[in-house]
Design a protein with these regions (language model features):
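N-terminal secretory signal peptides
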Residues: 1-26, 33
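A bilobed periplasmic-binding-protein/Venus flytrap-type ligand-binding module shared by bacterial periplasmic
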Residues: 154-161, 197-202, 277-290, 297, ...
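Extracytoplasmic ligand-binding site segments that recognize negatively charged/polar headgroups
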Residues: 59-66, 102-241
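A ligand-binding cleft/hinge motif common to bilobed small-molecule-binding domains
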Residues: 114-118, 241, 247-264
Length: 369
């Protein structure tokens, strides 16, 4: 699974910094946490490696990551940070494992990727003597993956079109008679099969294992009313901003920006949204050593740092202790607040770990037809 959301987070961060919405200091803090590079570590922390290699999704973000967090980290620890922007695709990870040539120390990945490679015996187990189980969401003190932050696929809509009776559920999203207008959905499938099945009458508690053929058939019914399957956060935002789409399933971070930038014209809801974690993994045989990787991952659990990331990007904190530190006027934007979690649906990462590739192939064949 490709972590397009992590790429999008940095685009949002750069945009907010350029607009003066966040200070340079908070920009550096947020960028550092985003890729699990702490700005400060204990002065007596020992490192066995000459460098730490982080793998992300590349492009212009390589230089931005270096400026934002690589230099401060090197100044704090003496360890150079190398950012590999070639992209941690499942194929690239598998190639390193097969060749026994591991070049990445910390990898940003969706949780299902970590679960899948953990089952294959390819990952270092997390060292919970360094990490705190009290600083993760319930059920996420797992063997091979732990969240860095959370995000949601939410239903956003144009309130000028729908007024006081807007679409608020997957059933409404599929009801083109009651809610006319073009739609947009996520190109890489996450949450879209679930939305289709709920619209087709499946109860959220009965979603898994997903009935992929049934979900695809439901999406095919809606295709004439889908203007685009978006592949980037910027694309999803543009479609709604310019009125090409009347509604869409998009990331909550982009929905929040849209609401602000349109003066509330674009609204959105956590009701029956789909909650997903971004997670850290470490391959066995990583050059810097597992202890160093665990020190980095443990450092990202600090609640104050996670609030910096929330305020910069809108990502839900992985550490529940951070919720109380979020300014009161922003808590309604937190996708992992108790109120938001109560009305959302957790994407089943274990199902995705076992079925993602096969299901995605069928999904892409449908959307590209």
């Amino acid at each position: 699974m490709r972590n397009h959301f992590q790429q999008d987070c940095f685009e949002i961060l750069l945009r907010r910094a350029a607009a003066g919405d966040i200070s340079r200091r908070n920009f550096v803090k947020a960028a550092s946490l985003l890729l699990s590079v702490p700005l400060s570590l204990r002065a007596n922390m020992a490192f066995a490696a000459d460098q730490l290699v982080l793998c992300n999704w590349g492009g212009d973000a390589i230089q931005a990551y270096g400026d934002a967090f690589g230099v401060p980290f090197t100044e704090a620890t003496g360890i150079p940070v190398k950012i590999d922007g070639s992209g941690p695709t499942e194929g690239a990870i598998q190639a390193q494992i097969a060749s026994k040539t591991i070049i990445w120390d910390v990898i940003d990945a969706d949780a299902n990727v970590g679960i899948a490679f953990g089952k294959k015996g390819a990952l270092e187990p997390l060292d919970w003597s360094k990490l705190s189980r009290d600083k993760v969401r319930k059920g996420w003190d797992r063997e091979f993956v732990t969240p860095s932050y959370f995000f949601s696929y939410v239903l956003a809509y144009d309130s000028e079109i729908f007024g006081d009776a807007p679409p608020v559920s997957p059933a409404d999203f599929w009801d083109t008679e009651k809610f006319p207008g073009m739609r947009t959905m996520y190109k890489w499938m996450n949450g879209m099969l679930e939305a289709a099945l709920i619209a087709d009458g499946v109860a959220p508690a009965d979603l898994y294992p997903l009935d992929v053929p049934r979900a695809l058939a439901k999406i095919e019914q809606l295709k004439p009313d889908i203007i685009s399957f978006w592949g980037s956060g910027a694309e999803s935002q543009q479609l709604l901003m310019e009125g090409e789409a009347a509604m869409g399933y998009i990331w909550n971070t982009r929905a929040s920006l849209l609401s602000r930038d349109t003066g509330g014209r674009i609204k959105w809801t956590f009701d029956q949204a789909f909650l997903n974690p971004s997670s850290w993994i470490t391959l066995k045989g990583n050059p810097a050593g597992p202890a160093t990787a665990m020190d980095f991952i443990a450092s990202t659990q600090k609640p104050e740092s996670q609030v910096v990331l929330f305020e910069a990007l809108g990502n839900g904190p992985a550490n529940p202790e951070a919720d109380a530190l979020i300014p009161e006027d922003q808590r309604h934007l937190n996708c992992v607040s108790p109120e938001a979690v109560a009305v959302q649906i957790n994407l089943d990462q274990d199902w995705y770990a076992d079925n993602y590739s096969a299901a995605l192939e069928k999904f892409l064949a449908l959307v590209s037809a």
